[in-house]
């Protein structure tokens, strides 16, 4: 089925806009995945703030040209499903990783984050990034732990001086 030139330009523009505002991108091969499973993936992606699209490789190469995701060009072989994370850098990687557990034929090809190429076997690095709320919670627990340790140390010094004075 041939796509009209205007439609191709619209697809390239849409994907390019998604790439410009995205925090990370993940590329996968969805060959052999059922339509109902793909529909479920798209629904989960919308809920997670992830833009998912199946695009022809030539159009995809044009769409990411001039963005930090042009490093993914070598991964654009065969049927390509691309996902851009808009709210959290690890959202698309986490979504695809979870989806791949239930789908034998779903294969993650590569990812890109902050201008760096991430191979499929290293996707866990991106998928395990903490969300903003998780990172803040971790930081607060570290700060709270250090503060309470300082308070206990000061109390011990005070008690020691009081015992020495008595």
Swiss-Prot record:
GO terms classed as biological process: translation
Sequence intervals crossing the membrane: none
One function term, GO molecular function aspect: structural constituent of ribosome
Record keywords: Ribonucleoprotein, Ribosomal protein, RNA-binding, rRNA-binding
Family: Belongs to the universal ribosomal protein uL10 family.
Subunit-structure text: Part of the ribosomal stalk of the 50S ribosomal subunit. The N-terminus interacts with L11 and the large rRNA to form the base of the stalk. The C-terminus forms an elongated spine to which L12 dimers bind in a sequential fashion forming a multimeric L10(L12)X complex.
Entry-linked NCBIfam families: PRK00099.1-1
Cited function: Forms part of the ribosomal stalk, playing a central role in the interaction of the ribosome with GTP-bound translation factors.
Entry protein name: Large ribosomal subunit protein uL10
Organism (species): Pseudomonas putida (strain W619)
The encoding gene: rplJ
């Amino acid at each position: 089925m041939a796509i009209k030139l205007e439609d191709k330009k619209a697809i390239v523009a849409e994907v390019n806009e998604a790439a410009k505002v995205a925090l990370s991108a993940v590329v996968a091969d969805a060959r052999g995945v059922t339509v109902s499973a793909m529909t479920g993936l798209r629904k989960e992606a919308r809920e997670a703030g992830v833009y998912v699209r199946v695009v022809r490789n030539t159009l995809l190469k044009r769409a990411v040209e001039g963005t930090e995701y042009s490093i993914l060009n070598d991964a654009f072989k065969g049927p390509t499903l691309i996902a851009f994370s808009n709210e959290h850098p690890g959202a698309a990687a986490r979504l695809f990783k979870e989806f791949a557990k239930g789908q034998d034929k779903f294969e993650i090809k590569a990812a890109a984050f902050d201008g760096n190429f991430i191979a499929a076997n290293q996707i866990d690095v991106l998928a395990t990034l903490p969300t903003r709320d998780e990172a803040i919670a971790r930081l607060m627990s570290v700060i709270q732990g250090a503060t309470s340790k300082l308070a206990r140390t000061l109390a011990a010094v005070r008690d020691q001086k009081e015992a020495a004075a008595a």
